[in-house]
């Protein structure tokens, strides 16, 4: 599960800027392309960009408490492996994305000294807030934060009824990254 989780729109955007996409990974239709703990990355050319979306299930209240304990070690291993790959390949740019959950990756000692940027998905055309943190060596200036009227709820609240829009209850919908944010 995890490292190369680039949506097709993000891949196309990178291609328009002259980046070559590793076709063996880009052809996959699902969001998870390989298990970074087992995959042999030495067969690929040095990447210019690494984007990693570390799964948030280990810290999500939507995950059963018993499962969260088991998943925390896995999340820590994925985070360490992602940072190892960034150090090994030294890409020009790297990004690690994860919800800004106070019990999540934000707390990881591995992430403590890395530059980060916070944003809220509602500021990128999504009907729900979802505060997200992106650690990166690229200056992500202008990241938008929620300015929603606190007296009115967002159109959709993840994990709480989905505002009559069941499509947001599906895992693929929750894992999506807003296209305008990808193009930022």
Language model feature labels by segment:
Residues 1-184:
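Conserved active-site and SAM-binding loop architecture
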């Amino acid at each position: 599960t995890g490292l190369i989780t680039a949506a097709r729109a993000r891949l196309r955007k990178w291609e328009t800027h002259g980046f070559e996409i590793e076709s063996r990974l880009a052809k996959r239709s699902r969001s998870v392309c390989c298990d970074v703990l087992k995959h042999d990355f030495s067969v690929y050319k040095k990447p210019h960009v690494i984007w990693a979306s570390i799964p948030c299930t280990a810290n999500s209240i939507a995950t059963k408490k018993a499962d969260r304990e088991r998943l925390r070690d896995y999340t820590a291993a994925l985070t360490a492996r992602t940072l190892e790959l960034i150090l090994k390949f030294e890409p020009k740019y790297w990004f690690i994305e994860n919800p800004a959950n106070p019990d999540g990756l934000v707390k990881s000692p591995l992430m403590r000294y890395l530059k980060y940027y916070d944003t809220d998905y509602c500021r990128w055309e999504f009907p729900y807030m979802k505060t997200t943190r992106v650690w990166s060596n690229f200056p992500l200036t202008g990241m938008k934060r929620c300015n929603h009227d606190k007296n009115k709820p967002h159109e959709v609240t993840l994990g709480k009824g989905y505002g009559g829009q069941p499509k947001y209850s599906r895992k693929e919908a929750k894992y999506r990254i807003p296209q305008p944010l990808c193009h930022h």
